[in-house]
């Protein structure tokens, strides 16, 4: 732009280093005292060849030693040992365990605010002496003389401050006296109140208690507010009210005094008529503060409607306060407050129906929740809730913007309404759209617009599934035989009355599939119990026509439930009451179906093999061993057979405050008391056994199994099995296999039905076809081609059969950590007691008697490496303390000191081997992981794991020298991510009877079949549930099946679940902990767990570089910091921008540089086609999909190979730090990388047809030529006419064989030529590049972990994903704030403009907005923070049209002026994205 208009262009805005926006949301920073981020800050000068260009500057300065220590303490687990207990050697009974605090860091020994203990003092004493030893030569003073005063200074207390001056006290007293004389001199009283308010705000609670007589002041204020003479002194009253509010804030004790002075009715009177809006708003603010502690008193005063009667005339701030008063009061409702609620509800209902402000809606939901919880038992309760109010509550559950907590409360409200009133229950069924409410509430968790319900449910929180399932349960009348539920139905018969049969049938037909999917996809016990109860109640109400429609779904579910009898036994051999409860529930459902619809369901029951399962269950139930005397009666959690809502105190709302010693903490809001709804029966094992046997006998007698006959279809299947197992059946050609597939298809699919999963496996059909496929000698290409031709129109149906069989057969178990409270994220901070016993001669090995038998409280996720460090540290400390005693009484010689130092140095290098259960443990294993895996392997009860003290033996390591050299080598390379699954990469798992089904699914997937039907809902739910066990994951104790299935059969799981699995198992300990802390952000147990807050801290490393040498500098960064566990952040010299925006731009620019032609890394064909993707098409860059160029063996290729190594590190680094790349890789590139990383798989496929298909994706014209040669391989004349030699097509410098340039192609050597070209394009020609990429990638984390992601997905992740810029998507994922709303015309124009952008403009816009030209996976929905547009105000007399938009890249914030027309807006936007790129400057 010209200079005189330069003020119009606002470049990318930036932030100071301590701005919240510059922080990556995936990690957490440490701050020093001044608020600066603690971390590395390296500077890159503008010299490309300087070998020492990395230096530390500024407040981030840290040398190499500090760097290593930083890495160690942040990524590794040093300091995870909490307690140290000393015991007498050999004494195991009646010992006194004296706990000794172990510091978190060996380098940090300063005492904090904790009480000082003698061991701490001695340790500091010893370390100070050791430091002084090194500098004490030639000094006369003894080290003790210098160290002792320091210790004493630490113990000494501080001098207390002097008391407040008497003059100030007198002044305060005079001001308070003035307020008491307000009727005589209102002005003096008002000024006195102003000064008092200001003084109070500068005091703390202790000062207020000491110098202000609160009773007097509050009494005077109450008198001012109630004095009729002062009624017109509105400014005085506002100042009085504000002074009282400030007093409440500083000294919460004063609230109770004010309530005793009857301040509430006085303030309420000020709202009857509003003549001064400022006074009204101050009154509302004051009463709201009182309501947080004394809501009950406000409720007693009555007339709640006064607070909201002028709601529409108040500012949004005052509206929130008014609703908060009502909400806080409703949290303390009792049954005798019914009239008060009746009075206020007519005013609240329209507000509730029309409110859009989320804080107001949250308060209103809390109010309704409190009303339901307290008044549900009142006679006229149902009159409080009209149909429009109920529909509004249903709507809140449905809409996406409602927070989860509010949705759960709304569902609880609906549940209480349905339970309390038959009329409301019927209205909910017939006049509201329950199905739409459920499905829309689930859609918010969908990862893609087209995801099926089974995919979405995997990500729905259990709490929401529980609430919806429970609500459906209470909608219907109880089942006749209540086995799982404990309700004693007290309502009249109206609940079972169906006034609209058509509506009811439609509801049931839609609900049952949803319930079946919830059961299949949820692994939570309570969710499944609710679903079973709901199904029992729904089935009890349906007729034959409805039952026919849901026949197959119910029977498949029952078959899946009853087939899980293997999981009913715990690891220690006892019977699981939870699994037994579900089995009994499944049998009860089957019994009900048999009673009502035996003829209708019999064929399906038979086809699914239900009878065989029931027979087996009879034996299992009879074999239940009641080791303890169980009560055969049902144990209920409440009164026998009574379903009711009970109110329990909510932890957040009823804390007790210690007025004497601590400042009272007033909550920001008061949550209503929790509604506890009891529906479940708790079944004893004795009841499960007796009831199970009873149900089995009833089912078998009803169906008369003896009359079951072998059907004609089974005869046909047996015939097909015999054909498949006959060795003479031809399978050598494509036609042979078409015949086999045709026979199989005809056997499986019939006009009226398809073979069930049970029939497919039980008849041996699955096994025989699997054997035939795996033993076939024909190429995979022929197998796949023939299968697709035959099964083309019914692949999804075949997949459904296979998935049904897998769901029924799999019996993989979820393991938990054995905690009584269920674990969760707080389990990461748990400690476990271990007893360390030295296995050897302690005195001979200088171990020390105290360490020969030691009890240690250690973090579960601590590794044995940290345990080794702990022992070395203790040995050195004890040795040093022992050496002090003679040194204090006699002067030591230089030789003595040198000998002692050598001894200590030897101890510091000592290493130990550890043994648990007589087995040597891996040093990288976690303590909990080793103990946990042993418990599982030995079938021990996991709950005892937390009660026992576990003995771990240790001895002097025989590999000490080797380990020292390895440690030194690792130190030189820099700290790396801790990999706790490294030695379990390809653990083999016995998949049992499901092996054949898994093999068939794998075959179908390898045929290139694209279908969501590959995802198995049940296994996906199990894996998601397993990943919800943080302690198991972080300890490296995930079950083998989870590792095996995700690597070997990744198609069984949705992308997001696999991505989460990758993050949990491969991204290092620090990021793993941070991932769960982010997921659990806001939970109360997380906030209160200080130990957990200290876990998983990740260091940020800030690197400042020059734009002129960005690529060369980037390579050096990758070389030095590529494997670092720190988060890397980039800044540019002479630019103010920091944080996410410049970092994303760095990754984008380096991505582009890697695609330069001059690097000679990629295939570059002059005849190459252009991709549909729109990219920068300058001559300097590769425009086709990136695929390695074959290397010329006679050229120097070291630079190219080195670049591929850097590329691998760069790509892995982007995954680790969650950065967006801008590559356009060929899918074949990752296919070959995957094959190279998979054991027992060749990099290049063995059949030519498959190879040609891969080449076609790389170079379509070359593939076409090769296919032509293959088609004419016997036509010598045609081949010779091509005049081809044995060189790589397009590159005559690379010969396929020695002397290939002189050898011509003919019919006798055509196969040699084809294989030679394939080998150069896909094999030997690019092998070194592929290996270099894998090695570079694996410097960050092992590339083998990437096998759980498909090549197509990796291509999308690294830049080729299609982006949705539709207007609907933009409206959904854009926020308008600070001057704009989503209804603003400017926002409509803006969305219309950017949705019409071309691909080049989109890239520019994203580069301008975020720093990267690409959106993350998931599109605009995945932008974090959310894309936000705010108003940019014109200043200095300029108009909005003279300004350009500006951005805050770290916050995805666009500041948009209010342009006068759409055309001007488009022009200014295009100008900004074109000219505003390339720098991050202050606007």
From Swiss-Prot:
Residue ranges of every copy of the HECT domain listed in the record: 1376-1483
Q: Catalysed reaction(s)?
A: S-ubiquitinyl-[E2 ubiquitin-conjugating enzyme]-L-cysteine + [acceptor protein]-L-lysine = [E2 ubiquitin-conjugating enzyme]-L-cysteine + N(6)-ubiquitinyl-[acceptor protein]-L-lysine
Location of region: K-box:
1007-1081
Acidic residues: which segments have biased composition?
61-70
* UniProt function note: E3 ubiquitin-protein ligase which accepts ubiquitin from an E2 ubiquitin-conjugating enzyme in the form of a thioester and then directly transfers the ubiquitin to targeted substrates.
Give the record's family classification: Belongs to the UPL family. K-HECT subfamily.
* Matching PANTHER family: E3 UBIQUITIN-PROTEIN LIGASE HECTD1, E3 UBIQUITIN-PROTEIN LIGASE TRIP12
- What's the name of the protein? Ubiquitin fusion degradation protein 4
């Amino acid at each position: 732009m010209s200079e005189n208009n330069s003020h119009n262009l606002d470049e990318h805005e930036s932030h100071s280093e301590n701005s919240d926006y510059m922080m990556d949301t995936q990690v957490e920073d440490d701050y020093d005292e001044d608020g600066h981020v603690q971390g590395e800050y390296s500077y890159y000068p503008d010299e490309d060849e300087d070998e020492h260009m990395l230096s530390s500057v500024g407040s981030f300065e840290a040398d190499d030693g500090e760097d290593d220590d930083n890495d160690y303490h942040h990524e590794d687990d040093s300091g995870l040992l909490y307690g140290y207990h000393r015991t007498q050697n050999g004494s195991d009974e009646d010992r006194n365990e004296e706990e000794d605090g172990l510091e978190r860091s060996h380098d940090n020994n300063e005492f904090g605010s904790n009480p000082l203990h003698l061991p701490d003092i001695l340790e500091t004493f010893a370390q100070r002496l050791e430091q002084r030893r090194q500098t004490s030569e030639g000094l006369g003073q003894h080290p003790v003389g210098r160290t002792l005063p320091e210790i004493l200074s630490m113990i000494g207390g501080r001098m207390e401050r002097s008391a407040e001056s008497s003059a100030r006290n007198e002044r305060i007293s005079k001001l308070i006296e003035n307020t008491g004389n307000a009727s005589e001199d209102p002005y003096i009283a008002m000024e006195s109140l102003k000064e008092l308010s200001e003084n109070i705000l500068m005091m703390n609670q202790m000062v207020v208690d000491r110098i202000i007589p609160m009773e007097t002041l509050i009494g005077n204020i109450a008198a001012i507010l109630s004095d009729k003479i002062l009624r017109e002194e509105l400014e005085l009253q506002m100042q009085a009210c504000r002074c009282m509010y400030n007093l409440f804030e500083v000294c919460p004790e004063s609230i109770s005094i004010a309530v005793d002075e009857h301040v509430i009715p006085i303030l309420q009177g000020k709202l009857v008529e509003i003549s001064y809006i400022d006074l009204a708003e101050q009154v509302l603010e004051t009463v709201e503060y009182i309501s947080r502690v004394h809501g009950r008193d406000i409720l007693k005063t009555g007339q709640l409607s006064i607070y909201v009667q002028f709601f529409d005339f108040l500012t949004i701030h005052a509206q929130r306060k008014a609703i908060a008063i009502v909400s806080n009061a409703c949290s303390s409702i009792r049954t005798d407050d019914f009239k008060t609620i009746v009075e206020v509800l007519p005013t609240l209902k329209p507000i509730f129906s029309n409110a859009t402000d989320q804080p107001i809606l949250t308060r209103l939901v809390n109010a309704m929740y409190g009303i339901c919880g307290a008044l549900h038992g009142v006679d006229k309760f149902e009159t409080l809730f009209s149909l429009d109010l109920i529909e509004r509550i249903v709507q809140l559950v449905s809409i996406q913007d409602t927070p989860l907590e509010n949705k759960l409360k709304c569902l609880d409200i609906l549940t209480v309404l349905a339970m309390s009133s038959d009329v409301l229950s019927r209205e909910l069924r017939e006049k509201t759209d329950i199905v739409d409410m459920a499905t829309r509430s689930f859609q918010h968790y969908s990862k893609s617009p087209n995801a099926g319900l089974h995919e979405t449910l995997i990500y729905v929180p259990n709490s929401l599934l529980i609430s919806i399932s429970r609500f459906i349960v209470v909608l219907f009348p109880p089942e006749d035989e209540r086995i799982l539920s404990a309700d004693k139905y007290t309502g009249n018969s109206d609940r079972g009355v169906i006034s609209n049969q058509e509506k009811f049938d439609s509801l049931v037909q839609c609900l049952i599939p949803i319930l079946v999917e919830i059961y299949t996809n949820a692994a939570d016990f309570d969710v499944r119990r609710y679903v079973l109860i709901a199904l029992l109640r729904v089935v009890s109400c349906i007729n034959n026509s409805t039952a026919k429609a849901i026949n197959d779904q119910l029977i498949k579910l029952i078959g899946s439930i009853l087939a899980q009898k293997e999981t009913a036994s715990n690891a220690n051999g006892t019977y699981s009451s939870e699994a037994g409860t579900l089995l009994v529930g499944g049998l009860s459902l089957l019994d009900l179906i048999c009673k009502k619809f035996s003829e209708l369901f019999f064929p399906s029951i038979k086809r699914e093999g239900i009878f065989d399962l029931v027979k087996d269950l009879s034996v299992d139930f009879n074999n239940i061993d009641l080791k303890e005397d169980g009560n055969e009666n049902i144990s209920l959690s409440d009164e026998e057979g009574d379903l009711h809502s009970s109110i329990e105190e909510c932890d957040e709302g009823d804390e007790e405050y210690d007025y004497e010693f601590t400042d009272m903490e007033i909550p920001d809001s008061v949550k209503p008391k929790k509604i506890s709804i009891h529906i479940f029966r708790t079944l004893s094992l004795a009841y499960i056994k007796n009831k199970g046997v009873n149900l089995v006998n009833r089912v078998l007698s009803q169906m008369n199994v003896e009359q079951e006959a072998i059907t004609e279809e089974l005869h046909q299947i047996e015939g097909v099995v015999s054909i498949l197992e006959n060795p003479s059946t031809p399978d050598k050609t494509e036609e042979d296999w078409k015949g086999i597939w045709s026979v199989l298809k005809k056997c499986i699919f019939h006009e009226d039905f398809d073979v069930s999963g049970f029939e497919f496996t039980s008849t041996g059909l699955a096994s025989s076809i699997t054997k035939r496929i795996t033993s076939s000698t024909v190429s995979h290409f022929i197998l796949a081609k023939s299968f697709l031709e035959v099964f083309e129109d019914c692949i999804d149906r075949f997949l459904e059969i296979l998935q049904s069989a897998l769901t029924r057969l799999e019996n993989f178990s979820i393991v938990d950590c054995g905690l009584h409270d269920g674990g969760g994220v707080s389990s990461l901070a748990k400690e476990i007691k271990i007893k360390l016993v030295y296995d050897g001669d302690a005195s001979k090995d200088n171990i020390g008697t105290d360490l020969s038998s030691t009890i240690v409280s250690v973090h579960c996720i601590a590794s044995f490496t940290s345990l080794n460090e702990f022992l070395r540290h203790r040995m050195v400390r004890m040795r040093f303390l022992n050496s002090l005693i003679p040194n204090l009484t006699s002067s030591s010689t230089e030789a003595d000191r040198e000998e002692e130092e050598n001894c200590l140095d030897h101890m510091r290098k000592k290493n130990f081997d550890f043994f648990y259960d007589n087995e040597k443990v891996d040093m990288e294993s976690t303590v909990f992981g080793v103990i946990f895996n042993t418990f599982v392997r030995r079938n021990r009860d996991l709950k005892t794991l937390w009660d026992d003290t576990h003995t771990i033996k240790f001895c002097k390591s025989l590999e000490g020298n080797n380990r020292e050299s390895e440690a030194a080598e690792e130190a030189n390379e820099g700290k790396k991510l801790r990999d706790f699954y490294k030695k379990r990469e390809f653990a083999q798992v016995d998949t049992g009877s499901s092996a054949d089904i898994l093999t068939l699914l794998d075959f179908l997937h390898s045929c290139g079949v694209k279908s969501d039907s590959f995802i198995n809902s049940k296994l996906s739910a199990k894996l998601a549930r397993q990943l919800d066990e943080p302690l198991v994951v972080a300890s490296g104790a995930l079950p083998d099946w989870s590792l095996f299935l995700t690597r070997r059969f990744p198609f069984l799981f949705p992308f997001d679940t696999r991505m989460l699995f990758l993050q949990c198992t491969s991204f290092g300990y620090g990021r793993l902990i941070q991932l769960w802390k982010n997921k659990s952000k806001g939970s109360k147990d997380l906030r209160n767990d200080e130990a957990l807050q200290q876990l998983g801290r990740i260091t940020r490393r800030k690197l400042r570089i020059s734009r002129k040498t960005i690529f060369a500098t980037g390579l050096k960064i990758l070389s030095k910091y590529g494997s670092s566990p720190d988060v890397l952040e980039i800044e540019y010299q002479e630019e103010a921008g920091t944080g996410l925006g410049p970092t994303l731009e760095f990754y984008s620019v380096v991505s582009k540089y890697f695609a330069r032609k001059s690097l000679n890394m990629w295939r570059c064909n002059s005849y190459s086609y252009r991709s549909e993707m729109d990219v920068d098409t300058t001559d300097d860059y590769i425009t086709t999909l990136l695929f390695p160029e074959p290397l010329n063996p006679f050229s120097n290729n070291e630079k190219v190979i080195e670049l591929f190594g850097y590329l691998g590190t760069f790509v892995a680094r982007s995954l680790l730090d969650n950065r967006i790349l801008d590559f356009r890789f060929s899918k074949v590139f990752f296919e070959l990388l995957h094959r190279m990383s998979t054991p027992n798989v060749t990099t290049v496929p063995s059949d030519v047809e498959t190879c040609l298909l891969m080449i076609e994706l790389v170079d379509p014209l070359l593939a076409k030529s090769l296919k032509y040669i293959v088609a004419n391989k016997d036509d010598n004349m045609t081949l010779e006419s091509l005049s081809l030699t044995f060189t790589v097509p397009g590159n005559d410098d690379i010969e396929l064989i020695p002397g290939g340039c002189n050898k011509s192609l003919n019919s006798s050597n055509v196969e040699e030529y084809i294989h030679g070209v394939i080998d150069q394009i896909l094999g030997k020609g690019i092998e070194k590049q592929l290996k270099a990429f894998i090695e570079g990638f694996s410097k960050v984390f092992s590339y083998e972990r990437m096998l759980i992601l498909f090549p197509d997905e990796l291509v999308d992740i690294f830049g080729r994903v299609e982006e949705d810029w539709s207007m609907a998507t933009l409206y959904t994922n854009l926020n308008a704030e600070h001057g704009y709303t989503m209804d603003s015309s400017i926002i409509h124009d803006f969305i219309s403009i950017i949705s019409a952008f071309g691909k080049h403009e989109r890239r520019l816009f994203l580069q301008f907005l975020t720093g990267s030209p690409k959106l993350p996976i998931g599109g605009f929905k995945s932008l974090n923070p959310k894309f936000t547009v705010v108003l940019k105000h014109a200043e200095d007399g300029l108009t909005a049209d003279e300004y350009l938009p500006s951005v805050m890249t770290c916050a995805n914030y666009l500041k948009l002026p209010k342009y006068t027309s759409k055309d001007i807006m488009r022009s200014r936007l295009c100008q900004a994205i074109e000219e505003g790129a390339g720098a991050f400057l202050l606007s």
